[in-house]
């Protein structure tokens, strides 16, 4: 069992990264292996919204025309048994680099999750708010909407903040160990929340 951890922070020693490391520790304790991808170390361009309708080969072929590091990460996602998306919270939303990545991801998976391999893959979202903490639940909601659109089976969304960080580290380790059992949400495959 392998989990891919996608880190949307540029601080390898920050709270978001530390939380992701705790989850990885639990996953490995549960018998799995992990790989962490730090988006800040990679070249990922923003979506170009190809063609007049804003869709290009992402819609027709489930891949992106842009030549950068996105395709390599997408291939790793398709091979993973579980995917963890860990992001700091900026203005009650995803970090800019996580938003750029997930914007591209939802384009290549929308209505094609079964074909491209993301359908039903267990996923966890982790959203770390360093300020007041009020933005973490909103960020989790936004991340959940994107991941459901991509076809993932959302098994947990975990908001956390600096005020409860030490407690949540224990939760992350336990959650990682649980994730190694390949849990499911119980929702039907391909369930999406309505996009308004």
Predicted regions and their residues:
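Short, glycine-/small-residue-rich phosphate/pyrophosphate-handling segment
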Residues: 95-97, 110-156
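N-terminal beta1-alpha1-beta2 submodule of the flavodoxin-like/Rossmannoid cofactor-binding fold
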Residues: 1-111, 158-160, 164-196
């Amino acid at each position: 069992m392998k989990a891919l951890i996608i880190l949307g922070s540029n601080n390898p020693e920050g709270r978001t990264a530390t939380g992701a490391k705790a989850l990885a520790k639990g996953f490995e304790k549960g018998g799995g292996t992990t790989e962490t991808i730090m988006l800040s170390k990679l070249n990922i361009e923003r979506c170009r919204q190809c063609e007049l309708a804003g869709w290009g080969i992402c819609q027709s072929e489930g891949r992106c025309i842009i030549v950068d590091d996105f395709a390599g990460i997408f291939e790793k996602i398709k091979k993973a048994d579980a995917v963890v998306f860990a992001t700091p919270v900026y203005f009650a939303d995803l970090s800019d680099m996580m938003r750029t990545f997930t914007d591209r991801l939802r384009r290549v998976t929308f209505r094609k999750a079964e074909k491209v391999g993301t359908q039903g893959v267990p996923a966890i979202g982790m959203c770390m708010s360093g300020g007041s903490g009020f933005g973490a639940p909103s960020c989790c909601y936004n991340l959940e909407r994107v991941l459901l659109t991509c076809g993932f089976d959302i098994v947990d969304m975990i908001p956390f903040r600096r005020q409860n960080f030490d407690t949540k580290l224990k939760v992350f380790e336990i959650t990682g160990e649980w994730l190694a059992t390949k849990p499911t949400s119980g929702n039907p495959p391909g369930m999406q929340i309505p996009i308004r």
